Amino acid sequence: MSKTLKKKKHWLSKVQECGLSGVGGDPCSLLEIRGGAEHGEFPYLGRQREDVASFIVGKVPSQGDVLLEVNGTPVSGLTHRDTLAVIRHFREPIRLKTVKPGKVINKDLRHYLSLQFQKGSIDHKLQQVIRDNLYLRTIPCTTRSPRDGEVPGVDYNFISVEQFKALEDSGVLLESGTYDGNFYGTPKPPAEPNPFQADPVDQVLFDGEFDTETQRKRTTSVSKMQRTDSSLPEEEDEEEREAVNGSSGSTDHRDRQEPSEWGKTVPSYNQTNSSMDFRNYLTRDENLEPLPKNWEMAYTEAGMIYFIDHNTKTTTWLDPRLCKKAKAPEDCEDGELPYGWEKIEDPQYGTYYVDHINQKTQFDNPVLEAKRKKQLNPAPSEGTVHQEPENSQFTRDPSQLKGALLHTSLKKSAMGFGFTIIGGDRPDEFLQVKNVLKDGPAAQDGKIAPGDVIVDINGTCVLGHTHAEVVQMFQLIPINQYVNMTLCRGYPLPEDSDDPVADIVNTVPPIINGQMLTQGDINMGSQELKSGVIDLDQRGKPGLMVVNGRLNGPSLDIQDQRTSMASSGNSLPELVTIPLLKGPKGFGFAIADSPMGQKVKMILDSQWCPGLQKGDVIKEICHQNVQNLTHIQVVEVLKQFPVGAEVPLLILRGGPPSPSKVTKVKSDKQELMGSIEAIAPGEPLPQPLPFPPNLARSCSPKLDPSEVYKKSKNIFEDKPPNTKDLDVFLRKQESGFGFRVLGGDGPDQAIYIGAIIPLGAAEKDGRLRAADELICIDGVPVKGKSHKQVLDLMTNAARNGHVLLTVRRQIYYTDKQQEEEELQHTPPAHNGSPRLNRIEVSAIPKLPAEAYDVILQRKDNEGFGFVILTSKNKPPPGVIPHKIGRVIEGSPADRCRKLKVGDRISAVNGQSIVELSHDNIVQLIKDAGNTVTLTVIAEEEHRGPPSGSNSARQSPAPQHRPMGQTQPTYGTLDRYSWSDHKADCGPALPAGSWQALSVGCYPVELERGPRGFGFSLRGGKEYNMGLFILRLAEDGPAIKDGRIHVGDQIVEINNEPTQGITHTRAIELIQAGGSKVLLLLRPGTGLIPDYSLAPSSLCSYVKPDQQ
């Protein structure tokens, strides 16, 4: 009787997954873990406790099953000790992925490594993972000689052939073979690590977040070497498998009927109470590729699957891999929802739909809506002039593309790759090159042209990727590194490619008010964000206005807004931040006067100002508002930057918008009713849509409310009113995190964010602001900690390559804002569904008052020319107690034309002064030297929370009394009493009477090294400037200390103030200190004032012969 042919199954089909929860103690007490690389074995399961089934969710694994992964982390190749460490690292529930041992994969690690597999296969990848884990604890050996740059004992252990044979015969080598005539082998790792060896657990868990220097490189020689036993055994078929514990083959037969049971989610609970279509989520296709780098799949306590993006520290319900397989809405079946959509059944609002990707809500079913639009706008007939080209049909298969494929390699410059892209709004839309920027890398390469479809980036097919995903891929490539791209030529640009909304898409997106703009964003400046203009959400799209965490106004349809904005033509203004680089002859452009300010007259050398265009109006230079400066003043501001400085320039491009071209929110109800044509007369206005997912129904899994309360109670229970707390996650760049830390000089002094370094990580992120109070660093509260302790926490974060900051930001009231918010108070949500009172559009308040910086520069024989008034009584929460009481005619404050009586001052030189006393503020301004930066909120924008009647509107501003007279008390100003003081109205104080600054500065004591203290100075009285750190010597005491940075101002040297002293005197003070020097430093911005003097005359290293 002939035996029926059976289909051989890969061991992958036998992999099973289970969840371990409710243990309470050590999970290893429930399931014994045996094996380990030190024994030449995979980790595998040993004895099990009798009650193990009560703690397992899913199928209970058997004794002897090979352990492959723990919570998605591969443990093959780890030692027994490290495997236990990985298991104990995770909180419950713990997911275990195991496989029954067979002929290919079993306990024998040496056997598996000896097999040859096809490159790119599952087994080949698993072998590489095993080697990566082995190299954390062991070092491969070879009989060849060391090559240039290789370090014995680090890259390889270089041994003789005799030694190698001895190791092989003793069974110490897990794998061995020959490559290029030399022997290579991988020894077993020791059971216990070297006491000086780093703990590899974090590298195993978050491999991509560590520097490549700390990871052992994969050895090509070991991967490609010829092994003595490399024949691949056939895996046994399903029907031949032996019965376990007396069970028959029926179970196996059942497993065979259900494909890929190992890949199903465990447990199979409903993912949500809503009707979100998770059919594609519950079964994982074997052909589905692995999760993107630094992504992880996890379970909630209820067993629901969610995904963690370790790149951004965010979570989502959406499987990022399924985005590529998403169908267009019109192609979905009845009852099916497009990728990223969710159906909500709400008892008050009825049924509505949430688009988690675009973060919008609507009442219409998106599938039915798309099919209805498709029927109303059928495909053009053959006789239509604008016939759709045959080759424009979208595909995710590169082999199906119509056109010529081309390959190119571009080197990333400081301005990116030199081309802009468009598309990727929908899953079925190509991403195409829109423009090739002149003189950029793409233009110099000469291969890329507008319309080219981006097919592949560094080996990753991006057909079907979203615009944001591709932009992020380009952003992750470091400057001066290359990108390899495959493009397809033969597809026309879309018809709306000249749409101004679509035109602001760049490979390196423009930065608008600190936020990067991406495809589909509507670009508007702060001038448009006033009363009556549609508010834009955090992505620049029209939506619900949020003030102090509350929702006001309806959600407008994004597509309608896109159409209305696009109809405004090319005159739509846009604010764009362009990074400039100062060359030997300047920035490469000329400016001229215009009614709107200084505008670009011509481009002289575009390599220093790429992206700048003729006619651009300059708004800010390095975050300094220059709109009201004269032509000469703007030229002087640009001249102060040294050659090689990178300067962000904020420009206004395009003409001012016509009032008829900007969609307004009518304050008059009758106007509003008349402007909505779709509503019949007498029909009530529809209720505003519920919260979008980013406000009420988060697109991320929520923690248990009690858990959130417990975690936050200790830190935030004394949170002051009118403040908001936010978390900011930053990744470290080469220059650090991009901000300075102030405060912490005393136990009661708070820690604040100081200067935001231009083009640094914090500025690129855009969420952190100067004067934010620092609450936590990576979950560690900093209240009561010293400045040094905070720096130590930041140093530890720098070692990890990222930091999570919790900051507290003061919220300042605008006119009538509090009353409006009280009228529109929103009840709390019930059962996860939002509740929203019916409100009229006219009730939308203005945005919180916009603060702006004013930089004042004075001469030695004059003061800054303004008087600060401070409230004697403690004002209500949200009111800034310091305001301008007088501006002296002809003074720097008067000449700048930006300060007026009544303006509130919230910060000085980036340091919040809201909680400071008047004397401290005056001293802070005195110690600023000849330049001070004030953060101002205009008087008409800041009125504080209203209370009954506001007498400030009925009473004139108090006149400042002449010097020498009694300081009066004004009881009519905002109903508070104020005292007026002169702040720097007269000449600068002599050096002897100048007091050391205690707020915002920090002391640093250095011991002289063999070559001095390791820093150089610039400035002094003879150069009409203060003293600044110019350079830091490599391996010098200053750079080793870690607190001194280029651009920091020296306030004191050995307890002697530097106000008004010469450069020579500063050197003498340092010499007088002997082997030590004590410096009091004020954090700078990283830039050093340059008054066009020769650098050699402004700086000198402090060397031993000078001391």
From Swiss-Prot:
The residue ranges flagged as biased composition, category Acidic residues, are: 232-241
Pfam families on file: Guanylate_kin (PF00625), PDZ (PF00595), WW (PF00397)
Disordered as annotated region, ranges: 210-277, 374-398, 941-975
Q: Where in the cell is it found?
A: Cell membrane; Cell junction, Tight junction
Q: Which first-to-last residue range defines the signal peptide?
A: none
Q: Does the keyword Thylakoid apply?
A: no
**Membrane topology value:** Peripheral membrane protein
What InterPro entries does the record point to? GK/Ca_channel_bsu, Guanylate_kin-like_dom, Guanylate_kinase_CS, P-loop_NTPase, PDZ, PDZ_sf, WW_dom, WW_dom_sf
Boundaries of every Guanylate kinase-like domain copy: 110-284
Q: What are the annotated GO cellular component locations?
A: bicellular tight junction; plasma membrane
Indicate whether Cell membrane appears among the record's keywords: yes
The annotated regions of Polar residues compositional bias extend over: 220-231, 267-277, 947-957
The family note in this entry says:
Belongs to the MAGUK family.
Summarizing the function annotation, the protein's role is:
Acts as a scaffolding protein at cell-cell junctions, thereby regulating various cellular and signaling processes.
PANTHER family xrefs: MEMBRANE ASSOCIATED GUANYLATE KINASE-RELATED, MEMBRANE-ASSOCIATED GUANYLATE KINASE, WW AND PDZ DOMAIN-CONTAINING PROTEIN 3
Recorded protein name is Membrane-associated guanylate kinase, WW and PDZ domain-containing protein 3
Organism per entry: Xenopus tropicalis (Western clawed frog)
Query: Which gene does this sequence derive from?
Result: magi3
